Every structure is written in structure tokens, then in C-alpha cells.
């Protein structure tokens, strides 16, 4: 009996570990990767993108992300989209929000970006009542 309980406990711990490593992105990941409010000030858009991609830890293990979007709004404006929504629901803001697209222009020797600023509607993916994925932006 004790061996059986130990076996099931080990299986449960393994399942939890795997789900944490390969599971759904978290709200904290979403905020770190896509929300910059209030917008951090830099002398130009290229400097903004180059510093923010490093500061937020978006490029890891020598890999440069080809495109990343930062949304410059209070996170609560995005959180409200996911209230009472099922997991994996995609929701789009009705209003346009300020966003910055950071696009990779060179990957060696270091990641280098250029940027563009827009006012776009923002589509997010929801999980657990919170945004966890930026699905895109639209004029």
C-alpha cells in the first residue's frame, strides 16, 4: 500500500513538473514580453527596441526573436478582455492602443532591431481569466 501511494505521488510530481516546463504561457510572461506601461523613454525607436528586448529577456541563448510587439497601456485594459472567457479564447480591444513593433534587422554579432509605432487594436489569448498571449495587432 505504501509503495502504491509513493508511486502515485511520484507520477503526480512528474506531471506537475512537465506541465510547468511545457505548459501554457503565464500572465507574468505576457506582461514581461508585451506590456510596457508607461512607455519607457529612449532617444529613438531603435534604441527603445534594442534595449527593451535585452532588458525584458526576450532574446535568450543567442537566439534573436524576429518580431516583438510592446503594448503601451495599463494592463487592466487588457485584463478586462479575458474576464469570464474560456481558456484559449481570443479577444480584441474595441479601441486602438499605442503599440511598438520591434523588428529584427541583424542577428550577428548581437541582435539589432528597428521599430515602428502604431495605434492598433490588440488581440490577446486568454487563460485562467487573464491574457497570456499576444495574437496580433490590427489597424
From Swiss-Prot:
GO MF term set: endonuclease activity; nucleic acid binding; protein homodimerization activity; RNA nuclease activity; tRNA-specific ribonuclease activity
Active site, UniProt feature: 34, 133
Chief localisation class: secreted
Superkingdom, natural source: Eukaryota
GO terms (BP aspect): angiogenesis; defense response to Gram-positive bacterium; hematopoietic stem cell proliferation; negative regulation of apoptotic process; negative regulation of translation in response to stress; stress granule assembly
Entry binding sites for tRNA: 102, 122
Disulphides: 49-102, 64-111, 82-126
Class of enzymatic activity (EC top level): hydrolase
Localization in the cell: Secreted; Nucleus; Nucleus, Nucleolus; Cytoplasm, Stress granule
One Pfam family, short name: RnaseA
InterPro entries attached to this UniProt entry: RNaseA (IPR001427), RNaseA-like_dom_sf (IPR036816), RNaseA_AS (IPR023411), RNaseA_domain (IPR023412)
Keyword terms, alphabetized: Angiogenesis, Cytoplasm, Developmental protein, Differentiation, Disulfide bond, Endonuclease, Hydrolase, Nuclease, Nucleus, Protein synthesis inhibitor, Secreted, Signal, Stress response
GO cellular component, one term: extracellular space
Functional note: Secreted ribonuclease that can either promote or restrict cell proliferation of target cells, depending on the context. Endocytosed in target cells via its receptor PLXNB2 and translocates to the cytoplasm or nucleus. Under stress conditions, localizes to the cytoplasm and promotes the assembly of stress granules (SGs): specifically cleaves a subset of tRNAs within anticodon loops to produce tRNA-derived stress-induced fragments (tiRNAs), resulting in translation repression and inhibition of cell proliferation. tiRNas also prevent formation of apoptosome, thereby promoting cell survival.
PANTHER family recorded: ANGIOGENIN-RELATED (PTHR11437:SF10), RIBONUCLEASE (PTHR11437)
The family this protein is said to belong to: Belongs to the pancreatic ribonuclease family.
Protein name: Angiogenin
Record organism: Gallus gallus
Gene: ANG
Amino acid at each position: 500500500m505504501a509503495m502504491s501511494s509513493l508511486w502515485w505521488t511520484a507520477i503526480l510530481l512528474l506531471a506537475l513538473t512537465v506541465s510547468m516546463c511545457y505548459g501554457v504561457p503565464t500572465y507574468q510572461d505576457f506582461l514581461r514580453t508585451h506590456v510596457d506601461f508607461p512607455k519607457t523613454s529612449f532617444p529613438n525607436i531603435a534604441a527603445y527596441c534594442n534595449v527593451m528586448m535585452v532588458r525584458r529577456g526576450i532574446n535568450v541563448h543567442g537566439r534573436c526573436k524576429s518580431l516583438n510587439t510592446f503594448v503601451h497601456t495599463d494592463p487592466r485594459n487588457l485584463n478586462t478582455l479575458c474576464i469570464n472567457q474560456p481558456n484559449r479564447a481570443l479577444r480584441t480591444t474595441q479601441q486602438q492602443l499605442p503599440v511598438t513593433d520591434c523588428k529584427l534587422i541583424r542577428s550577428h554579432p548581437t541582435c539589432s532591431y528597428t521599430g515602428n509605432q502604431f495605434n492598433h487594436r490588440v488581440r490577446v489569448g486568454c487563460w485562467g481569466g487573464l491574457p497570456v498571449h499576444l495574437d496580433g495587432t490590427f489597424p
